[in-house]
Curated annotation (Swiss-Prot):
It comes from Arabidopsis thaliana (Mouse-ear cress). Activated by calcium and calmodulin. Autophosphorylation may play an important role in the regulation of the kinase activity. GO terms for biological process: positive regulation of gibberellic acid mediated signaling pathway. Ca(2+) 1 binds at S472. The lineage of its organism: Eukaryota, Viridiplantae, Streptophyta, Embryophyta, Tracheophyta. Residues 118-128 have a biased composition (Basic and acidic residues). Residues 1-13 have a biased composition (Polar residues). The active site is at D272 (proton acceptor). There are 3 contiguous domains conserved in the CDPK subfamily: a kinase domain, an autoinhibitory (junction) domain and a calmodulin-like domain. The autoinhibitory domain (411-441) inactivates kinase activity under calcium-free conditions. This is CDPK-related kinase 2. Ca(2+) 3 binds at N540, N542, E549.
């Protein structure tokens, strides 16, 4: 397992604010650079500038002595005269195969030139038609005094700067400069536009880099942000030799989880969380941590999934590689950061980028090597629950702040969890039988889980009768809303919760509605909990039900052979739901999945 111990050196410090090079390498022969820029799938994939292909060195030509082509006279009169040839056979040239290879390469290159030229012409024509006007202010020179360059990335660079006038006069800031010449496609233009929109829309969190303004001229776009002079989190990890104590790691992770939970509530997924994208405000040991670089971020609704592959290889989640993901992908990245903080090594490592991707998809992180045996059980459990490959089993950022390892560190205000919306929506659309099953399962919740749900219930401002309604949810959203929440259309999602418009929900039902069966299944106590839940269901919720009625409750169409699918869901002795049917009902196993298994 490779240690997180080095960073690419450069005469100019890598720019923490600048957008990263988005290149996806699929060739196993391409080494994975430790400081490599984020990956982004693209129809046109360029070779990495860090790893050019090497051409063979020219062979040294050996001078050979010429041979006599004539036969000459024989020393014996009885010998047969040698046959005379027009020219002698020369020894095989040691450089001939090299010349052949170079000739074939030249032919291929010449054949490819027309296609390459055509592609370049098409790109130039496309670029000519691109609208690179963003509508930003053009008064940069009158308001901002640019200083020296402090960092450089593939698509731009960052300068220190000062405000010349106004309330912020003499305030030091960082200005990210993105040349418009680098914006060669509509996608790259939209990326810049979206980054500014997200920075402008997100506000009000102490661990979020402050955005001041955006400017443009004919040559560049300028994004003015808070100047963080304390360096990257990665620098501090390296300065410590790659290992943090558990308490020091908690102090870092609490800040990361808090700001990520805030972004997720606003409907923003960062998609490139890594130590390089967290900066300290000052050199002080206990200075505040700020998340930066929203160049790959996007808006996402609670019921929406993204499909483009973006991020950095070591931190990318499995579902991103499968092209179907949402906010849980950020939580995976936090799990990788937590693993590095506690042991100094990456959980997934390989010599090539494609090898890293295979490890992310197939391998399990090791908790057997030092220092893991000496760390607390709670610390290991915390990291494991962030690195579940199934995103449905992964903790959310808000839930992670309630994990026993974190919760015991100091008093933390738990942010509202966007997962609650998804769970309530699914609950309201469930059959009465599934609601009864969820109610039985909620009776087995642990104390820690109940504390988390109590905090979430309080965020929804229950009325004097102890009930939450659609209006109270709207009020809770308005209390926590930023402009980003409007962009991600989260308020529109409330239309799917109309079941609460005329009927409130008390805390007991809220627990049943909010419980995540997949998360609960990942706990060590699952087998015991599900057995106990079934016993409670037998006493209070189970009833005699025929297959046709069960099919109706599940919304199974008449064209589906329900007896084949649901036969094992019902006990033949008394016609009630079997334990297997109870478990499947809780998981919400679709009839399509069940039908596929019977074939």
């Amino acid at each position: 397992m490779g240690g997180c111990t080095s960073k690419p050196s450069s005469s100019v410090k890598p720019n923490p604010y600048a957008p990263k090079d988005a290149v996806l390498q699929n060739d196993d022969s391409t080494p994975a650079h430790p400081g490599k820029s984020p990956v982004r799938s693209s129809p046109a994939v360029k070779a990495s500038p860090f790893f050019p292909f090497y051409t063979p060195s020219p062979a040294r030509h050996r001078r050979n002595k010429s041979r006599d082509g004539g036969g000459g006279e024989s020393k014996s009169v009885t010998s047969t005269p040698l046959r005379q040839l027009a020219r002698a056979f020369h020894p095989p040239s040691p450089a001939r195969h090299i010349r052949d290879v170079l000739r074939r390469r030249k032919e291929k290159k010449e054949a490819a030139l027309p296609a390459a030229r055509q592609q370049k012409e098409e790109e130039e024509r496309e670029e000519v038609g691109l609208d690179k006007r963003f509508g930003f202010s053009k008064e940069l020179q009158s308001r901002i005094e640019l200083g020296e360059e402090i960092g450089r990335g593939h698509f731009g660079y960052t300068c220190s700067a000062k405000f010349k006038k106004g309330e912020l006069k003499d305030q030091e800031v960082a200005v990210k400069v993105i040349p418009k010449s680098k914006m060669t496609s509509a996608i790259s233009i939209e990326d810049v536009r979206r980054e500014v929109k997200i920075l402008r829309a997100l506000s009000g969190h102490q661990n979020l880099v402050q955005f001041y303004d955006a400017f443009e001229d004919n040559a560049n776009v300028y994004i003015v942000m808070e100047l963080c002079g304390g360096g990257e989190l990665l620098d501090r990890i390296l300065a410590r030799g790659g290992k943090y104590s558990e308490d020091d790691a908690k102090a870092v992770l609490i800040q990361i989880l808090n700001v990520v939970a805030f972004c997720h509530l606003q409907g923003v997924v960062h998609r490139d969380l890594k130590p390089e994208n967290f900066l300290y405000t000052s050199k002080e040991e206990n200075s505040m941590l700020k998340v930066i670089d929203f160049g790959l971020s996007d808006f996402v609704r609670p019921d929406e999934r993204l499909n483009d592959i973006v991020g950095s290889a070591y931190y990318v989640a499995p579902e991103v590689l499968h092209r179907s993901y949402t906010t849980e992908a950020d939580v995976w990245s936090i799990g990788v950061i937590a693993y590095i903080l506690l042991c100094g090594s990456r959980p997934f490592w390989a010599r090539t980028e494609s090898g890293i991707f295979r490890a992310v998809l197939k391998a399990d992180p090791s908790f057997d090597e030092p220092p893991w045996p000496s760390l607390s059980f709670e610390a290991k459990d915390f990291v494991k629950r962030l690195l579940y490959k199934d995103p449905r089993k992964r903790m959310t950022a808000s839930q992670a702040l309630m994990h026993p390892w974190i919760a015991g560190y100091k008093k933390i205000d738990i942010p509202f969890d966007i997962l609650i919306f998804k769970q309530i929506k699914a609950y309201l659309r469930s059959s009465s039988l599934r609601k009864a099953a969820l109610m039985a399962l909620s009776k087995t919740l642990t104390t820690d889980e109940l504390l988390y749900l109590k905090a979430q219930f309080a965020h929804l401002a229950p009325n004097k009768n102890g009930l939450i309604t659609l209006d109270s949810i709207r009020l809770a959203l308005a209390t926590n809303a930023t402009e980003a929440m409007k962009e991600s259309r989260i308020p529109d999602f409330l239309a799917l919760l109309n079941g609460l418009q005329y009927k409130g929900m008390d805390f007991e039902e809220f627990c049943a509605a909010s419980i995540s069966v997949h998360q609960h299944e990942s706990l060590d106590c699952w087998e015991q909990s599900i057995r106990h839940a079934y016993e409670l269901f037998e006493m209070n919720g189970n009833r005699v039900i025929v297959i046709e009625e069960l099919a109706s409750e599940l919304g199974v169409g008449s064209s589906i052979p329900v007896h084949t699918i649901l036969n094992d869901w019902i006990r033949h002795t008394d016609g009630k739901l079997s334990f297997l049917g109870f478990v499947k009902l809780l998981h919400g196993v679709s009839t399509r999945q069940s039908l596929a298994k019977t074939r």
